Every structure is written in C-alpha cells, then in structure tokens.
C-alpha cells in the first residue's frame, strides 16, 4: 500500500457532494451514553463512537474560536486504493484564529490491530493528498489526537 500511496495523485473535478449528504433522519443513540447535546454542531444532538470523540466534541463546544462543526456522515468519503476513507470532522474556525477557516480532522483512537492501522494510515495519506489538491488553500486536513493538538496546528500555521 505504501508504494501506491506514494504515487497517487488527485485532481480537482467539477463535482461536489450535494448538501443532502448531511440529511439525517434521526440520531440513534442514548443521550449521555453515546450521544450528546450540541449547540455548534449542524444538528442538536451528535453521536460519538469513542471516549476520544466525546472529549473532542466537548472541547469544540466549549471553545470560542469554533464557529461550527459537523461529524461527517458515512456517506461522505474519499476514494482510495485501499477503499473508502471517511474523515471524522469538518470544523469552521473564526477567521482571526487561523489562515485556514476550514479544517478536516481525523481523530481515530489507536485501539485497532496493526494491519487495520496500516490500512487506515495509508487512507489518511491519500486524504492529505486529496485535500491538498482540492481545497484552494482554505482548508487544512490533519490527523489529531486531541483538540489541543488541533489548536496547536492551526495557530502555528497562521503565523
């Protein structure tokens, strides 16, 4: 997979995801267990998949520099040679914080097998190449382990 990723290229096309990709029938979960109320999210309630995601969402909600965010649906993906890659979050920052008003964040926890992690890392490398070619310089993509790491990335790159 590493050799394929080294040579993969993405090119901008004139197609976009329709806003219906964010149409959601209902959040299915248990409030306080795997779902939480949200004010800055696209929806009133958000389901999280891990403790790391829950902590990340809480920090997004608390921080004044966050304009809005969305946990990206499974219907939003980037095609890669290793299969579909589903980024976790789309985040909109207030303009004064970063030169990148938009940020796509990957917050995967490392509790999967070595083989799964290698495949996921290859998909993440493809996503980096995808977003570098298709965003017009206004969007930053990165894997982050915490909200604090996200802030460090956007504030260092705005200097």
What are these regions (language model features)?
Residues 1-85, 92-159:
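Intrinsically disordered, low-complexity, repeat-rich regions
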């Amino acid at each position: 997979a590493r050799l394929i990723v080294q040579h993969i290229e993405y090119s901008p096309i004139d197609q976009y995801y329709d806003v219906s990709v964010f149409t959601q029938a209902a959040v299915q979960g248990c409030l306080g267990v795997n779902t939480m109320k949200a004010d800055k999210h696209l929806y009133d309630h958000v389901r999280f998949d891990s403790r790391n995601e829950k902590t990340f969402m809480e920090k997004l909600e608390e921080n004044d520099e966050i304009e809005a965010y969305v946990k990206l649906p499974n219907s939003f993906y980037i095609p890669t040679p290793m299969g579909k890659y589903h980024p976790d979050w789309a985040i909109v920052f207030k303009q004064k914080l970063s030169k990148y008003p938009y940020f796509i964040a990957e917050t995967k926890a490392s509790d999967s097998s070595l083989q799964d992690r290698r495949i996921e890392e290859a998909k993440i490398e493809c996503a980096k190449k995808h977003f570098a070619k298709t965003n017009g310089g206004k969007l930053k993509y990165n894997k982050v382990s915490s909200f604090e790491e996200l802030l460090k990335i956007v504030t260092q790159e705005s200097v």
